């Protein structure tokens, strides 16, 4: 889960900032530039259309997940790109200590699905759900936002009355 930058006064310029883009806060892409070191979490990329991602210049690592967009929840499959060797991951690589089955699954997903395939398949349903429930559409096909007080427990930021709502249950139940 990335730290959101809507509250820039919380950022310590000497500490690494974890940022999710698209944002874990609302599932939308953000233009981001901060002066501290950054680890960029692109977990939601496979649940959006293809867009240019703003990568802060001082980003040291970028993560991608196959869990959310491709429905591989619990598999813990992802990729990490680093500017410098990662101390722990580099050591594991030297001993060939990684999940070969997971690597094969990632390879199969990448060969058989476009990165925006799930977004293209489900975007119209997301729009229908958002219209029916008076939600605001997110860049991620299974997320929406609302300021409806009923959803106050879903708020991700105490200083904001916007709630992030996962709409995937409505897909599963065939409500729409």
Indicate where each model-derived feature is located.
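PLP-dependent class I/II
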Residues: 1-176
């Amino acid at each position: 889960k990335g730290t959101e930058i809507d509250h820039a006064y919380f950022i310590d310029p000497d500490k690494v900032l974890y940022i999710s883009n698209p944002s874990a806060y609302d599932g939308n892409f953000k233009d981001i530039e901060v002066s501290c070191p950054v680890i960029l979490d692109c977990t939601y990329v496979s649940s959006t259309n293809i867009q240019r991602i703003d990568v802060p210049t001082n980003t040291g690592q970028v993560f991608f997940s196959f869990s959310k967009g491709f429905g591989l929840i619990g598999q813990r499959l992802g990729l990490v790109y680093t500017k410098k060797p990662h101390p722990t991951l580099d050591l594991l690589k030297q001993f060939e200590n990684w999940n070969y089955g997971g690597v094969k699954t990632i390879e199969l997903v990448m060969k058989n699905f476009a990165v925006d395939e799930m977004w293209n398949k489900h975007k119209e349903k997301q729009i229908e759900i958002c219209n029916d429930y008076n939600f605001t559409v997110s860049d991620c096909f299974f997320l929406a936002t609302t300021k409806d007080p009923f959803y106050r427990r879903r708020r991700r930021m105490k200083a904001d009355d916007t709630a992030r709502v996962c709409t995937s249950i409505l897909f599963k139940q065939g409500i729409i």
